[in-house]
């Protein structure tokens, strides 16, 4: 994947001058939601969570020749009366392309009703689409137009709750055969509660053998952490991989490591990974994950979500 942002934005060559404009993140609400487009370097999928707690957060997926070329997580954050953008890129296995440290923030340069420019990055809004103009040094510019895909999401019957809500794989056991289409019901924009605060997830639908999602956790009107998540086809089955990030996108895991949850079993509207469960409910979506305790023990933590309404 070329070393350019997968963001719904474009690279510019000139740095910012003067003081950054004073604003909050609310004027960028139009970026929220799902976007898709094609360009010379392949297909770009993006899903942005709307403004909350002074931030926006997005997941990006690049597809080339029918295969995932890489993922990225991006945030736009209120800072010192203005905005900064941060971006971290990863390969198809969620191995990092940068260090574990938080990426250098890009200051806001200008903002209007139809355009936003950060240091080195620009996006132009044109009707119902976003135009990316990528000016890559020593290379030809790339232009990509992203539009909102039309999604028909069929009704998904709720799954039957099981006890215990989280299962763990038996030593030496194999994961069952499965394709990402089996968890297509995970796609969408979800908001709810978990870990004593607000939890939000946005999932891109299946493509090129993967789903990709972003998580934002908020407690006390402050972001506590983010996650970049994927569900991928691996060894004839599925695995959920994720990476955690501090509010400045400093990685909790080392760049080459992602937390992995192999599939244990799946049903039409539930997926039981090793230590993590997703299932559809009558109200939306429920997730359970085994979390560690300070005394070395563990306990299951519940997250419950409803579809975000426009």
PLM regions and their residue ranges:
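N-terminal helix-cap/turn-to-beta initiation motif at the start of protein domains
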Residues: 20-34, 174-189
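Central antiparallel beta-sheet cores of small beta-barrel/beta-sandwich binding domains
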Residues: 37-119, 177, 193-272
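Edge beta-strand at a domain terminus
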Residues: 93, 98, 103, 127-172, ...
């Amino acid at each position: 994947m070329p070393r350019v942002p997968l963001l719904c934005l474009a690279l510019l060559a000139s740095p910012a001058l003067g003081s950054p404009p004073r604003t909050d993140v609310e004027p960028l609400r139009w970026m929220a939601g799902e976007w898709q487009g094609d360009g010379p370097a392949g297909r770009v999928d993006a899903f942005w969570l709307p403004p909350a707690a002074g931030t926006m957060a997005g997941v990006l997926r690049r597809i080339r020749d029918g295969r995932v070329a890489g993922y990225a997580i991006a945030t736009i954050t209120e800072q010192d009366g203005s905005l900064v953008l941060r971006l971290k890129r990863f390969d198809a296995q969620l191995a990092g392309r940068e260090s574990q440290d938080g990426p250098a923030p890009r200051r806001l340069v200008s903002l209007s009703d139809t355009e936003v420019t950060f240091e080195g990055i620009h996006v132009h809004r044109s009707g119902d689409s976003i135009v990316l103009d990528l000016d890559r040094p020593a290379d030809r510019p790339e232009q990509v137009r992203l539009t909102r895909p039309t999604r028909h999401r069929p009704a998904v019957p709720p799954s039957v709750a099981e006890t215990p809500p989280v299962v763990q794989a038996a030593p030496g056991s194999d994961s069952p055969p499965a394709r990402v289409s089996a968890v297509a019901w995970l796609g969408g924009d979800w908001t709810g509660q978990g870990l004593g605060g607000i939890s939000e997830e946005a999932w891109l639908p299946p493509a090129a053998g993967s789903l990709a999602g972003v998580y934002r956790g908020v407690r006390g009107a402050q972001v506590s952490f983010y996650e970049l998540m994927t569900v991928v086809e691996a060894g004839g089955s599925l695995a959920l991989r994720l990476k955690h990030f501090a509010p400045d996108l400093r990685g909790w895991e080392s760049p080459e490591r992602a937390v992995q949850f192999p599939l244990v079993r799946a049903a039409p509207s539930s997926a039981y990974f090793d230590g993590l469960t997703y299932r559809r409910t009558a109200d939306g979506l429920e997730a359970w994950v085994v979390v560690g305790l300070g005394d070395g023990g563990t306990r299951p933590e519940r997250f419950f979500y409803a579809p975000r309404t426009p």
